[in-house]
Design a protein with these regions (language model features):
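Peripheral, non-catalytic segments flanking oxidoreductase cores
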Residues: 1-316
C-alpha cells in the first residue's frame, strides 16, 4: 500500500466549485506534508504512453556505439543521451545504475531562449522517437501548468502566478533505463537518495515497487502509483520559493531483490523548470515570525547551475 495521497486533476478543471476547492486543499496538504501526490485525470492518453515506451525501449536497445554518438559534450547532459553511471546524487561518488535521454523545451516565439537552450537531438535510427517525445513533453507541460495553478491558489497567489515563468521554461523530459544488474553493486543504487532541483516533477512509470520516499519519521515508504496515475512531487526550487512550506522530499530508486536482477526498469520523469530569470526569493506570505526566511535570494538559472555542478554534470 502506497502512503501517497491520490487526487484527480479533472476535479480542478471542472465547473464544480466544491470539487475544485477540495483538489486545491488536498494537493496543498499533501505537498506540505510528504511532498508527493499521485495524480489521475492528466492529459496523457494511453496510446501516447504506449508509443513512448515502445520508442524509448527501442532506443536503449541500440548498440552502445550508436547510443554514444548521441552523447553531446559541453552541455551538461541537457539534451540527448547520458551513458550508464555518469550521474551521481549530491554528496555521492558512486554513479547511479542508469542511462537516460533528455528531451528539452521546444521554443516557438523567443529567439533569446532559442539561443540559451541547447537544441534537441534527433535520433536518426528511430523516425518516430522525437515526435512522440515532443508530444509527451507538451502533454506533461500542460498537466504541470494546471497543477501549479492549483498550488498558486493554495499559496494565496493569483491563479496564473506561475504561467509567465513556465512558458518556454527550461523543462526536461527524461526517459530513464535501469539495466539488469549483473553483479552485486558496491554502494550504488539505481538512483541514490536525492531531492529534485526543479519546481515540480511529474513521473511516469511509478506503478511497480522501486521508488521510495522518506517521511517525517525518517522512514522510507513505497511510492506506488495506480495504473493511470502520475506521481508528482515538489522540487527544491518550489520549496525555496515557499520557504519550505511545500516540502521537497528526499526519494530514491532502490535496487530490486536478487531474483529480479535480470529485469530492466524504465521510468520517465518530467522536470518542470521555469525560465532562468525567475526569482526564487521566498514569497512574503510564506515568511513570518514563526517561519523565518530560510534561503538566500537566487534566480532559477543560477540555482540550476549550482546543482548541476554538484551532480557532476557540469564542471566548475
Amino acid at each position: 500500500m502506497s502512503a501517497i495521497p491520490s487526487v484527480d486533476l479533472q476535479d480542478f478543471l471542472s465547473d464544480h466549485p466544491q470539487k475544485k476547492e477540495k483538489f486545491i486543499e488536498d494537493i496543498g496538504s499533501a505537498f506540505e506534508d510528504i511532498g508527493f501526490v499521485a495524480l489521475s485525470g492528466h492529459f496523457l492518453s494511453k496510446e501516447l504512453v504506449d508509443k513512448l515506451y515502445s520508442e524509448i525501449k527501442a532506443f536503449f536497445a541500440l548498440d552502445q556505439e550508436k547510443k554514444d554518438a548521441y552523447e553531446i559534450e559541453g552541455i551538461g547532459g541537457q539534451r540527448g543521451y547520458t551513458s550508464f553511471g555518469k550521474e551521481h546524487a549530491k554528496g555521492r561518488k558512486e554513479g547511479d545504475l542508469k542511462e537516460f535521454w533528455h528531451f528539452g523545451q521546444y521554443v516557438t516565439d523567443n529567439p533569446k531562449l532559442e539561443e540559451e537552450y541547447p537544441a534537441n537531438v534527433t535520433v536518426t535510427e528511430l523516425p518516430e522517437f522525437n515526435a512522440v517525445g515532443k508530444e509527451t513533453f507538451r502533454m506533461l507541460e500542460k498537466t504541470a501548468k494546471y497543477v501549479l495553478r492549483a498550488l498558486a491558489l493554495h499559496l494565496n497567489l493569483e491563479e496564473t502566478y506561475f504561467d509567465a515563468y513556465i512558458k518556454n521554461g527550461n523543462s526536461i523530459l527524461r526517459p530513464i533505463h535501469y539495466p539488469p544488474i549483473t553483479e552485486a553493486p558496491k554502494n550504488a543504487e539505481r538512483a541514490a537518495a536525492h531531492g529534485d532541483i526543479n519546481l515540480i516533477t511529474l513521473l511516469m512509470g511509478a506503478q511497480g515497487r522501486g521508488l521510495q520516499v522518506k517521511n517525517h519519521n525518517d522512514e522510507w515508504v513505497d511510492a506506488i502509483a495506480g495504473p493511470d496515475e502520475l506521481m508528482i512531487n515538489v522540487g527544491d526550487m518550489l520549496s525555496r520559493l515557499t520557504n519550505n512550506k511545500l516540502k521537497s522530499t528526499i526519494h530514491k530508486v532502490i535496487n530490486p531483490p536478487k531474483e529480479m536482477w535480470g529485469t530492466s526498469r524504465y521510468s520517465i520523469p518530467f522536470f518542470m523548470h521555469p525560465i532562468s530569470e525567475m526569482p526564487l526569493n521566498c514569497l512574503e506570505n510564506c515568511v513570518d515570525e514563526a517561519h523565518p526566511k530560510q534561503f538566500e535570494d537566487i534566480t532559477a538559472g543560477a540555482y540550476l547551475n549550482e546543482r548541476l555542478v554538484e551532480l557532476g554534470l557540469v564542471k566548475k
